[in-house]
């Protein structure tokens, strides 16, 4: 039996395209939700006077994907702390929200809102409301990015690559229990899909990070806690994004080709068990999009 949720994520062109890429989603429809006018037109909604949010109706198979997983992935596609703005789009019609028509979904949805609050250190401004009305958008807005591959999209292209990577990695890891094997497959798949200079793990052993599975050129064997980018991420228990490695105090240069770097801690319970280290040959490669998705990938481990 199919179920339905409604997601307001900014411009519905990009939001619909994002949800179409989620395994278990069977149908998507862009439209206008939770306003004060029946059957509005795009031109009316655009005035920001009707109260509607650009929204995507998502029909999904709960045997394949859960409401909680849809909300988790949705949060990875938006800036949940931005009020009435996503990307370059500004106005109440671009506010973010999750609208439900089945109250039994509410506990699972709320749990993902709480998880987002913990990760962000603040409550999302994303609305969580029952659906009060939804009207499909005009035909020209449906499947917009399929019809116009070069059309405007407020989401970065790498968000779609990470979405596919995240889903495929979950299937690849399956029920394998060995952490080293899981790290090895993760490093391999990230390298295959994202083409970074170096991708690998350092494992926490005592007071030292010790080199684990990786893809790339030979690297440092050991890094002390608090040293370099990897040791700093371990000590802080937070992701560290470095736009220019030459500007990071105490940077440990394992490769002269590395220009920017991101390090994500792998946390179990309250303890860091490893860090995921990724380097790029270009300056400023990594940003909040990379951080959000790579943190979700580390949660799979």
Region spans (language model):
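Acidic-histidine catalytic/liganding microenvironments
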Residues: 22, 141, 193, 242, ...
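Intrinsically disordered, low-complexity terminal regulatory regions
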Residues: 164-221, 296, 300-301
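Short glycine-/small-residue motifs
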Residues: 274-275
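A short, aliphatic-rich beta-strand micro-motif
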Residues: 260-267
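Juxtadomain coupling helices with adjacent low-complexity linkers
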Residues: 170, 280-301
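Regulatory sensory and allosteric helical modules in signal-transduction proteins
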Residues: 204-256
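Flexible coil/turn and secondary-structure edge motifs
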Residues: 1-165
């Amino acid at each position: 039996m199919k179920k339905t949720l409604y997601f307001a994520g900014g411009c519905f062109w990009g939001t619909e395209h994002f949800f179409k890429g989620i395994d278990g989603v069977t149908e998507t429809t862009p439209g206008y939700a939770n306003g004060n006018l029946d059957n509005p037109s795009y031109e009316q909604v655009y005035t920001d006077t009707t109260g509607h949010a650009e929204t995507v109706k998502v029909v999904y198979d709960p045997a394949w994907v859960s409401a909680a997983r849809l909300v988790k992935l949705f949060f990875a596609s938006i800036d949940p702390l931005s009020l009435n703005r996503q990307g370059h789009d500004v106005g109440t019609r671009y506010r973010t929200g999750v609208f439900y028509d089945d109250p039994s979904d509410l506990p699972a949805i709320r749990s993902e809102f709480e998880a987002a609050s913990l990760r962000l250190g603040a409550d999302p401004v994303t609305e969580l409301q029952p659906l009060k009305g939804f009207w499909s958008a005009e035909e020209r807005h449906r499947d917009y990015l399929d019809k116009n591959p070069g059309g405007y999209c407020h989401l970065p292209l790498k968000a779609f690559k990470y979405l596919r990577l995240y889903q495929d990695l979950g299937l690849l890891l399956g029920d394998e229990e060995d952490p080293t094997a899981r790290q090895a497959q993760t490093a391999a798949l990230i390298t295959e899909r994202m083409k970074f200079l170096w991708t690998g793990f350092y494992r926490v052993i005592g007071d030292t990070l010790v080199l684990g599975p990786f893809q790339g050129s030979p690297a440092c064997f050991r890094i002390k806690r608090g040293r370099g980018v990897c040791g700093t991420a371990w000590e802080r228990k937070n992701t560290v994004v470095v736009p220019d490695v030459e500007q990071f105090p105490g940077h440990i240069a394992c490769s002269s080709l590395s220009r920017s770097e991101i390090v994500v801690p792998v946390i179990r319970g309250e303890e860091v068990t490893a860090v995921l280290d990724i380097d790029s040959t270009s300056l400023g490669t990594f940003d909040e999009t990379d951080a959000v998705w790579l943190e979700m990938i580390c949660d799979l481990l």
